[in-house]
From Swiss-Prot:
Phosphothreonine modification, residue list: 54
GO biological process: one example: nucleobase transport
Taxon lineage: Eukaryota, Fungi, Dikarya, Ascomycota, Saccharomycotina
Originating gene: FUI1
Name of the protein this chain belongs to: Uridine permease
Family to which the UniProt record says this protein belongs: Belongs to the purine-cytosine permease (2.A.39) family.
Amino acid sequence: MPVSDSGFDNSSKTMKDDTIPTEDYEEITKESEMGDATKITSKIDANVIEKKDTDSENNITIAQDDEKVSWLQRVVEFFEVKNDSTDLADHKPENPIRTFKDLQESLRSTYLYNTDLRPVEAKRRTWTWKQYIFFWISGSFNVNTWQISATGLQLGLNWWQTWICIWVGYTFVAFFLILGSKVGNNYHISFPISSRVSFGIYFSIWIVINRVVMACVWNSTLAYIGSQCVQLMLKAIFGTNLNTRIKDTIKNPNLTNFEFMCFMVFWVACLPFLWFPPDKLRHIFALKSAITPFAAFGFLIWTLCKAKGHLALGSLNDNGGAISKTVLAWSVIRAIMSALDNFSTLILNAPDFTRFGKTYKSSVYSQLIALPVCYAIISLIGILSVSAAYTLYGVNYWSPLDILNRYLDNYTSGNRAGVFLISFIFAFDQLGANLSGNSIPAGTDLTALLPKFINIRRGSYICALISLAICPWDLLSSSSKFTTALAAYAVFLSAIAGVISADYFIVRKGYVNIFHCYTDKPGSYYMYNKYGTNWRAVVAYIFGIAPNFAGFLGSVGVSVPIGAMKVYYLNYFVGYLLAALSYCILVYFYPIKGIPGDAKITDRKWLEEWVEVEEFGTEREAFEEYGGVSTGYEKIRYI
């Protein structure tokens, strides 16, 4: 059979050396293909099984991760504060929180910027000079002011010497408060934000914590004064022997079961008012301003009538007027400083209420005049009341509530009605003072620290809970202890205020770029370093505290030289001025950035300006995304 050139025959598949029939070849090929297919299928099946096992394991891992995410997400969503802002820029979708690292990042971003900390836009800046005058009228008429004024009498001063000290002290207060309030008035930012400028984005947390602690202490203190009003109200109704009728199991020389019960009554009565936002409480403050002056003047007239117009116009200490000039001089200094110590917290957080000023001048002249006048008047009422009561009872009462308690010795219907009515108004006054001066500021500051989980309402309730852990009955057991406590707090706060004022007025010439206050990018003016800390401010802060610290130890019972105590009596001036001077010296040798034209500390320039922040949320978003901190976007907006 011939063989084709290709080596294959058409009728049978044959090679030149071997011949294989077509049928056998097809069968062999088929079997070979089937074998290969079986092997491939087996491998595929094995891979599929292996993949299924791997997917199953992955699914279990993913399911476990999802369970963790769901648990963490549910906890975060349950506790986080809901954003009720009407600005669309404030409702930017947030990345889901899958891990604790995501939570940390979320806490960081909300700390830097949130709706409670944004600058106040024009529609919310409604305070005119009238509102600031009414604010200080309302703030001055409270029992605490009377107690501060009585401190001078107990130090050995007579009534007119004490009153002069009150005028001088609160004039200094007004001056320092105006200095502290300028940044809020012009840039419409709160104290937690303004403190970032001087101390750094992150070290300002410590500064805000100082303010929170003070707010909690004062909240507890005023709550206890309010509870003393409740005591008088109950005594006027049920009799003056409630302390003995109610079994005493506390065994504290400064507290009985009855007094603690009254403290809890007042504390619980304050809680419902913490639920409402600050703008809803304006009616409470308006009512307080309207009725408290009538109660104060009514009490003065009642006391003068009981004393038949006779006043103990000399000093109220045991030595009468027989005190040396040196002792008199230091008594005057301590009486003046008591006013500054009393205001150390409000001086610090003045931007919290001046940021609502309608115009540049709304908060300046009104406060400069109204504050010392209002406090001098109410202090005079306290001085005259204490002096009149001294002619009646021959006892040094430093609180008007102690005088009202003595009125109940003559348990007539008229005395009972008068004591109940005045005590009720004083209790309401303490409630309003606590809300405006402590609960709301504490809530604001706590919001700045942890805004994702704390708003003003929650912060106010936290402040109320902390106040229970403080023992104000020991703090208020005497005027000397009260004054000592005030001085102790001022040691720390005066140094903070000194640094902030020096930074704003001398170093920065009144210039603040508010965009940089809300970012922690490396180029931010107020980051200073990777830790967000201005070390110059920290060192100056420590220098301001150091001279007063020995006297502070002496005030709590440690034996220290008399010179240290005299420095301590001047604690606010010493801490404020030394911290400010130290900061200026450090900045002179180690300049900071963020001042237009690289102005030096010795240059005669003033760069302060009135800033409009109507679209701040949108502008900040653009600044963060496009402008960064170095492209000059802020110059377009501010310079």
